[in-house]
Amino acid sequence: MIQTQSTAIKRRNSVHKNLFDPSLYQIPEPPRGGFQHQKKEYSKETFSNQVFGYDITSLKKRFTQLFPSNIQGYLPEVDLRITIICSIWYVTSSISSNLSKAILRTFNHPIALTELQFLVSAVLCVGFASIVNLFRLPRLKHTKFSKALNSFPDGILPEYLDGNFRSSILHKFLVPSKLVLMTTFPMGIFQFIGHITSHKAVSMIPVSLVHSVKALSPIITVGYYKFFEHRYYNSMTYYTLLLLIFGVMTTCWSTHGSKRASDNKSGSSLIGLLFAFISMIIFVAQNIFAKNILTIRRKVGILPSSSTDDVTSKEGQPSLDKTRFSPLQVDKITILFYCSCIGFSLTLLPFLTGELMHGGSVINDLTLETVALVAIHGIAHFFQAMLAFQLIGLLSSINYSVANIMKRIVVISVALFWETKLNFFQVFGVILTIAGLYGYDKWGLSKKDGRQA
């Protein structure tokens, strides 16, 4: 009997099938398009743990040890990866914002500038994707430059780049799928309206005043999540955001006050403020809409799927009533390319029927110097958009709005030093803004529900 029982046990072990194993009932997923995304075979450095060859944890520890022990407890927690991305984002944004104002002084055609900006961005996307695809060839993929390209965070580059230009670029990257069009068409509309209104505002009022209006975006974002999504925020969130907004507006209005006598065009200023406000609303709407699309973490996706992830309950049994979502996300190069193409297409009709037909000076004003500035502006905008997409996926909507406020402070500070005009109220406004950012990071959104925004 003992031998028979052990034999039966061996037979059951040889079958080794659990009736509650969800893999028994898994239905093969249908193809998600004309091609199947495949996993990368390239060795890729973990960007979240390494920055320029240094370990993030050791760098943070060394930096903290520079301060006395009684001060270390008051230091805010710093994510070095996000700090580096934000720093580069601030530099490129400063270049882009100040160049747009410089271009519009001699080339006062906001719609034409928007059209050229979309065109340069689309060309850069195709060129960058082609270079990455080239260095996926077997003879080039082990070079240092190829390893640097492969160290980009997840979600930046397409997964299907394999070195074959015809299949990867011509047949996949340049041929949009239904998913890509569903994702990028609404964002292209946001880009179209946002860029035109922003350039219109910059052409009518100072850059500082445009950014002071856009500084209201965190308040609008918090209001949306509170009244429409029923999110909870503690009182410190509102206090720190108000301090933040007050600091930004103090800096901007103190800069604008010195120009009020020379630029006293009430009608033009009012229209410029209206364009800036519309641009701010578009920014908030795009931020909220793009959050679920640009987030790389495995959470709710944009398409339903029969993926086997998270399909079992705690007891190990298959869950039939649990909603499952697709982990499929569109990479940021593809999003930026098709957003630029859609924005270019939508801007083409207003450009042809407006500035080109009725303002015949567009071609005459497009000098060689203007073309060079537009090219530099387009390159800076390309990197700015890529970094913004990456930050939207890494940060919450409120944190991204605050990072965007800090970006505006850097832009305004660069403009102030560029114009060599600095007064007490501008410095006071910058200090208030930094204090608001510190307070928001230290005490704001302390509740778990608030962190999920």
Curated annotation (Swiss-Prot):
Cellular compartments per GO CC: endoplasmic reticulum; Golgi apparatus; membrane
TM regions (residue ranges): 111-131, 173-193, 202-222, 235-255, 270-290, 333-353, 372-392, 414-434
Membrane topology term: Multi-pass membrane protein
GO molecular function: antiporter activity; phosphoenolpyruvate transmembrane transporter activity
Keywords: Membrane, Transmembrane, Transmembrane helix, Transport
Lumenal side: 132-172, 223-234, 291-332, 393-413
InterPro entries referenced in this protein's UniProt entry, alphabetically: Sugar_P_trans_dom, Tpt_PEP_transl, TPT_transporter
Function recorded in the entry: Able to suppress the functional loss of YPT1. May form a channel. Protein SLY41 is not essential for cell viability. The SLY41 gene is a multicopy suppressor.
Family: Belongs to the TPT transporter family.
Other information: Present with 784 molecules/cell in log phase SD medium.
Protein name listed in UniProt: Uncharacterized transporter SLY41
Organism of this sequence: Saccharomyces cerevisiae (strain ATCC 204508 / S288c) (Baker's yeast)
The gene coding this protein: SLY41
